[in-house]
UniProtKB/Swiss-Prot annotation:
Molecular function GO terms recorded: aspartate-tRNA ligase activity; ATP binding; nucleic acid binding
Gene3D superfamilies: Bira Bifunctional Protein, Domain 2, GAD-like domain, Nucleic acid-binding proteins
Reactions this protein catalyses: tRNA(Asp) + L-aspartate + ATP = L-aspartyl-tRNA(Asp) + AMP + diphosphate
Binding site for L-aspartate: 171, 217, 448, 489
Organism: Shigella flexneri
Protein name from the UniProt record: Aspartate--tRNA ligase
Chain residues that bind ATP: 217-219, 226, 482, 534-537
Keyword Ligase attributed: yes
Family per similarity comment: Belongs to the class-II aminoacyl-tRNA synthetase family. Type 1 subfamily.
Swiss-Prot/TrEMBL keywords: Aminoacyl-tRNA synthetase, ATP-binding, Cytoplasm, Ligase, Nucleotide-binding, Protein biosynthesis
Length: 590
């Protein structure tokens, strides 16, 4: 039906007869001439109808936005004065000789001249995806997956599919369950990741595996999360953690070079402890020049419990954040930041405004200055490298609250005051995570997943001091987003059972849930390691959007619903009966 795409026509096509298929993006009727902007997935070209082709001109008068049409015509060069430098096809136009209206369009529920609500865009997604910026994002996503496949093929990786209907295993979120009609009362789980299957593939001798795969997690959603998402999943045998990172870093550098024309250079490596200390986060945004500075040792003896308490508590922390030029912040802005950190459990936000350091106490403005002597204040200013015109914010509480609150404040202030250089790319690796974290109920939970190997520990050493264990894990972070994470896996049965035991999984439950894995570990398991990238998040970064739904063709809302198809929906009672499922209604509160 077509010979060319609208958006691919150039001066080299001048004089050629072409047939185009697409949609009316805009129509301008000048009486004796009608111009339309005709659009397809590759872009827009101007088509005009003149009186010499009366039948086509007459039919063109009926055109409206989003009519689906076919046009045959001749490509012509535009006059110099009519060239549109803002269009890729702006040097040419098509003189139409024939027009076919393939399908007409009703009045559109989306307005191309205004910003539509996200609810409307998701309900009429098939119209939203016609917009050039949305089409470009999905084209970029397709390019990324193509580049990934070629790179992985070139590096000896095999694309192997793993099951979608599998067994529920604890991986940190709730599973989506699928009832079995054949096995009454039993359920499959949709995979949160192919984690165990890819490890089993390593045990099967396929030493380099990858897969671009759908995963599912029934969890509370955030702006950058979806109940179903796509991973670039990777696993290797006989490779160390640095070797895995080297190959995966090369993949991401390749993507940025091909898609953005940017060489990311070598990625710096930072430990989890350093990232938390300097940035209050395990996914720091290195475009932001600000860092946290520990000052607890300077405040242990002050008669101000807000500072002295955490300063003398082994589980406490007092951190300072120097904001260059922050002395110009208004009282209202300071109060807003104080309320902001309360979201993370902080009780408030102390500060020192540095107006003129040379004047000592008279050169600062601070509600806590009366609790601090000149020597302590000077020591704080020295340690934070404060200069005239700066602001110093303080966080004082337990380590987690300080890290969470001050880390979030660092990011917010950096963005609000334009301190974060958004023209840059700042990738890094974060390594050496704690193996376990407190579950809040006196037990431990795996910080990554229970198949991650500890670093330089025997099973006996791990069992004796699990709280000291460092995971042989690594995350890739770009501009403050975790785009991928992985680890060296446990390849020894005793170690795996030790980890299960630390997590409170008894031997009976181990056999019930992971018997197949424990059996496989008995038969010459190779050392193996892997990683998974979030394809949606990578695409989000590479297309410059901050909304992950912009890079998924048919995404869910934050309530895990599809507004277009109205999924989820009630099931047919007959289908439920076949599955031996009865829906129990919750009793209404009186």
């Amino acid at each position: 039906m077509r010979t060319e795409y609208c958006g691919q026509l150039r001066l080299s096509h001048v004089g050629q007869q072409v047939t185009l298929c697409g949609w009316v993006n805009r129509r301008r009727d000048l009486g004796s001439l009608i111009f339309i902007d005709m659009r397809d997935r590759e872009g827009i070209v101007q088509v005009f109808f003149d009186p010499d082709r009366a039948d086509a001109l007459k039919l063109a008068s009926e055109l409206r936005n989003e009519f689906c049409i076919q046009v045959t015509g001749t490509v012509r060069a535009r006059d110099e004065k009519n060239i549109n430098r803002d269009m890729a096809t702006g040097e040419i136009e098509v003189l139409a000789s024939s027009l076919t209206i393939i399908n007409r369009a009703d009045v559109l529920p989306l307005d191309s001249n205004h910003v539509n609500t996200e609810e409307a865009r998701l309900k009429y997604r098939y119209l939203d995806l016609r917009r050039p910026e949305m089409a470009q994002r999905l084209k970029t996503r397709a390019k990324i997956t193509s580049l990934v496949r070629r790179f992985m093929d070139d590096h000896g990786f095999l694309d192997i599919e793993t099951p979608m209907l599998t067994k529920a295993t604890p991986e940190g979120a709730r599973d989506y369950l699928v009832p079995s009609r054949v096995h009454k009362g039993k359920f499959y789980a949709l995979p949160q990741s192919p984690q165990l299957f890819k490890q089993l593939l390593m045990m099967s001798g396929f030493d380099r595996y990858y897969q671009i795969v759908k995963c599912f997690r029934d969890e509370d959603l955030r702006a950058d999360r979806q109940p179903e998402f796509t991973q670039i999943d990777v696993e290797t045998s006989f490779m160390t953690a640095p070797q895995v990172r080297e190959v995966m870093e090369a993949l991401v550098r390749h993507l940025w070079l091909e898609v953005k024309g940017v060489d990311l250079g070598d990625f710096p490596v930072m430990t989890f402890a350093e990232a938390e200390r300097r940035y209050g986060s395990d996914k720091p945004d290195l475009r932001n020049p600000m860092e946290l500075t520990d000052v607890a040792d300077l405040l242990k003896s002050v008669e101000f419990a807000v500072f002295a308490g955490p300063a003398n508590d082994p589980k406490g922390r007092v951190a300072a954040l120097r904001v260059p030029g922050g002395a110009s912040l208004t009282r209202k802005q300071i109060d807003e930041y104080g309320n902001f950190v309360k979201i993370y459990g902080a009780k408030g936000l102390a500060y020192i405004k540095v107006n003129e350091r040379a004047k000592g106490l008279e050169g600062i403005n601070s509600p806590v200055a009366k609790f601090l002597n000149a020597e302590i204040i000077e020591a704080i200013l020295d340690r934070t490298a404060a200069q005239d015109g700066d602001m110093i914010f303080f966080g004082a509480d337990n380590k987690k609250i300080v890290a969470d609150g001050m880390g979030a404040l660092l990011l917010k202030v950096g963005k609000d005051l334009g301190l974060t250089d958004e023209s840059k790319w700042a990738p890094l690796w974060v390594i050496d995570f704690p193996m376990f974290e407190d579950d809040g109920e006196g037990g431990l939970t795996a910080m990554h997943h229970p198949f991650t190997s500890p670093k330089d520990m025997t099973a006996a050493e791990l069992k004796a001091a699990p709280e000291n264990a460092v995971a042989n894990a690594y995350d890739m972070v770009i501009n403050g987003y975790e785009v991928g994470g992985g680890s060296v896996r446990i390849h020894n049965g005793d170690m795996q059972q030790t980890v299960f035991g630390i997590l409170g999984i008894n031997e009976e439950e181990q056999r019930e849930k992971f018997g197949f894995l424990l059996d496989a570990l008995k038969y010459g398991t190779p050392p193996h390691a892997g990683l998974a990238f979030g394809l949606d998040r990578l695409t989000m970064l590479l297309t410059g959007t901050d909304n992950i739904r912009d890079v998924i063709a048919f995404p869910k809302t934050t309530a895990a619903a599809c507004l277009m198809t109205e999924a989820p929906s009630f099931a047919n009672p007959t289908a439920l009966a076949e599955l031996s499922i009865q829906v129990v209604k919750k009793a209404e509160n009186n």
